[in-house]
């Protein structure tokens, strides 16, 4: 059986906030504990009703980011995305990321830590925004990306913040397959 976990905030490019990461951790834990589940699909709902753009995840919601980091609805500063990366990376089941559109910043790092990535030929775009938002990936995303594409290319991706198409991501070994969106 397959568990599908999907971000569902398409109006903000499926950006995560503290509540989103808590929900993601809960869903991953449930999938891990369910002995009938063999594969986890990590994906996203969309497109955005505002502009029709598809997104997997744009990383941390900058509107939830305060001077001391990301602030939850309860006023506490936390984002726990590293816990989600760790859980995905060490899940005793296959975790396949299905990228229907933009995979940006922390969303890009999430696809990197998955066992496999399938990218929409028509809509998937990959980008790191660390330099743009002055929030560098101190977790698994940067290390695993370097293993996938090499040190120099990984630094280029993280430091320059360029957009990469699904085909470019495939060509450099970042995704396993480029598939039709439908």
PLM region spans:
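Crotonase-fold acyl-CoA enzyme core
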Residues: 86-182
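Conserved beta-strand positions that form and line the central face of beta-propeller blades
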Residues: 15, 55, 64, 144, ...
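Conserved CoA-thioester-binding segment of acyl-CoA-metabolizing enzymes
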Residues: 1-47
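Glycine- (often His-adjacent) and acidic-residue-rich active-site loop
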Residues: 12, 44-87, 103, 132-134
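Terminal peptide-recognition signature
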Residues: 5, 9, 23-24, 42, ...
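Phosphate-coordinating loops and pocket residues in cytosolic domains that bind phosphorylated ligands
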Residues: 15-18, 58, 67, 159, ...
């Amino acid at each position: 059986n397959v568990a599908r976990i999907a971000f569902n905030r398409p109006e903000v490019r499926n950006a995560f906030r503290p509540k989103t990461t808590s929900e993601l951790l809960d869903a991953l834990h449930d999938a891990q504990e369910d002995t009938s589940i063999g594969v986890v699909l990590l994906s996203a709902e969309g497109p955005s009703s505002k502009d029709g753009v598809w997104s997997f995840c744009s990383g941390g919601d900058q509107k939830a980011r305060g001077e001391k980091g990301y602030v939850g609805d309860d006023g506490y500063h936390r984002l726990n995305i590293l816990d989600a990366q760790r859980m995905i990376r060490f899940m005793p089941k296959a975790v396949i990321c299905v990228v229907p559109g933009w995979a940006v910043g922390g969303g890009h790092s999430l696809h990197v830590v998955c066992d496999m990535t399938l990218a929409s030929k028509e809509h998937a775009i990959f980008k790191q925004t660390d330099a743009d938002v002055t929030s560098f990936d101190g977790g698994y995303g940067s290390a695993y990306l370097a293993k996938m594409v090499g040190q120099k290319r990984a630094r280029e991706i993280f430091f320059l913040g360029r957009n990469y198409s699904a085909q470019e991501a495939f060509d450099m070994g970042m995704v396993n397959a480029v598939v039709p969106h439908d």
